[in-house]
């Protein structure tokens, strides 16, 4: 079945055994800092993977496939453990676990991204909880530390703030996506965080862009 194949792909994308995907990880935040855009072991993608595994386990269980449901639950638990032990920075989740850029390839050029420490690997990101929205909209709460996620959202919002909203992360100081700000705001609402006053910033941005 297609769902099983997709879940297997995400499992195979982790080659280090910590649950975090490190293959095929370049995303569509094409104006973001390298750590956000194409680093390996991204927290943003790990949370998405965890969400995928938990809901796939529910689907497998409802179809009588207890074995595969167990595999998916185990993968979700592994990601959660890595999030708590390796990604948590005390007041926020890091952008990624990859701290060096020596083996990272820029997917746009096909060339090495550089050498030395990866700038922004431990930055504050507004995308951490991105993968939670669809499960939350359907009434399902993933097995995660929501107190930490709420702190992450609050602190990332503060650290990435500019006049018209937040950049991708505190390592990005120019590009802003209103759509991803709104997505963050929706997830925040489910955690009891009221970011409604951000709407005035987004409207001011639209007015500025269209004047």
Predicted features and spans:
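Active-site acid/base region of carbohydrate-active enzymes
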Residues: 1-43, 71-74, 78, 84-105
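Extended ligand-binding clefts on enzyme/binding-domain cores
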Residues: 39-46, 77-209
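A structural signal for well-ordered alpha-helices, especially hydrophobic packing surfaces
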Residues: 53-60, 80-83
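Inter-helical turn/loop segments and adjacent helix faces that build the functional surface
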Residues: 56-73
């Amino acid at each position: 079945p297609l769902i099983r194949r997709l879940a297997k792909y995400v499992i195979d994308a982790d080659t280090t055994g910590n649950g975090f995907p490190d293959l095929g990880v370049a995303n569509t935040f094409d104006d973001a800092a390298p750590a956000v855009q194409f680093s390996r072991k991204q927290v943003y993608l790990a949370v998405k993977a965890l969400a995928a595994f938990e809901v796939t386990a529910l689907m497998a269980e409802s179809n009588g496939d207890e074995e595969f449901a167990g595999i998916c639950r185990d993968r979700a638990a592994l990601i959660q453990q890595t999030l708590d032990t390796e990604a948590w920075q005390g007041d926020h989740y890091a952008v990624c676990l990859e701290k060096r850029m020596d083996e990272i390839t820029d997917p746009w050029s096909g060339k090495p991204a550089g050498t030395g420490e990866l700038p922004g690997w431990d930055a504050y990101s507004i995308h951490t909880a991105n993968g939670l929205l669809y499960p939350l909209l359907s009434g399902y709460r993933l097995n995660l530390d929501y107190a930490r996620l709420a702190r992450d959202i609050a602190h990332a919002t503060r650290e990435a703030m500019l006049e018209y909203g937040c950049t991708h992360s505190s390592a990005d100081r120019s590009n802003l996506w209103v759509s991803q700000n709104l997505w963050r705001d929706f997830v925040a609402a489910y955690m009891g965080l009221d970011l409604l006053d951000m709407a005035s910033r987004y409207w001011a941005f639209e007015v500025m862009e269209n004047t």
